Amino acid sequence: MKLIKIIITLFILQLAQGCSEPAGPSNSGVYLLLDTSGTYTKELTNALKLVNVLLVKLEPSDSLAVARIDTGSFSEKDIVAKTTFNDRPSEANKQKRHFREAMDNFVKEVKPSKYTDITGGVLQAAEYLNEKNTGRKTILIYSDLKEELPDGYVRDIPFQLEGFDIVALNVTKLRSVNIDPREYMDRLEDWQRRVEEGGGSWRVINDMDRLERIING
């Protein structure tokens, strides 16, 4: 529940920030990337709770998309569900119901992926939100951030993330971290560097007891 409260706080802060900026699109776009590799599929039930919170908090004209991270994630085929909420409450409620159904079915049927193309997922997320032209753009990455690519895949590509808020969620420590903790630290630092070099903002919501300070800092 703490994670859910913090996500709500994050959106309140974004709304407050938007009020002080020059006039422009005021709607929000959120793209959630879900890691489906190995045993991480067991974490998807918690991710489903996050989706339910987003469905409650997002408003008319806001956009929401959820996609899986798998072998080649720079593709619309990995989008599990997407929608832009209608101005009419009755239509918006239908959209939310269909979105929940799609997510429920996905969590029940998903099979673990051998590879994790996180970079491709971020590129696809940025492309999607840019096309939606939302005032606020947020990419949530529910993953351990360990990228593993099949032979031949090229992902040494600079991000273009100006105006994007990138939030890494539930970044679990792998077993190998017990042997060398630097692996975990280097993984986070590398992703932060790539995002910030691309003009985006980066934060990690991981330590539940310190989440509020992370967001406000």
Spans of features found by a protein language model:
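VWA/integrin I-like adhesion module and closely mimicked acidic/polar interface patches used
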Residues: K146-D190
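C-terminal motif of bacterial Sec signal peptides marking the signal peptidase cleavage site
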Residues: L15-G18
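Bacterial signal peptide processing site
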Residues: S20-P22
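Exposed acidic/Ser/Thr-rich ligand/metal-binding surfaces
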Residues: S28, P112-G163
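Sec-dependent signal peptide recognition
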Residues: K2-T9
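Von Willebrand factor
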Residues: S26-R136, T138-L140, T172-L174, M208-E212
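Von Willebrand factor A/integrin I-like adhesion domains
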Residues: P181-G217
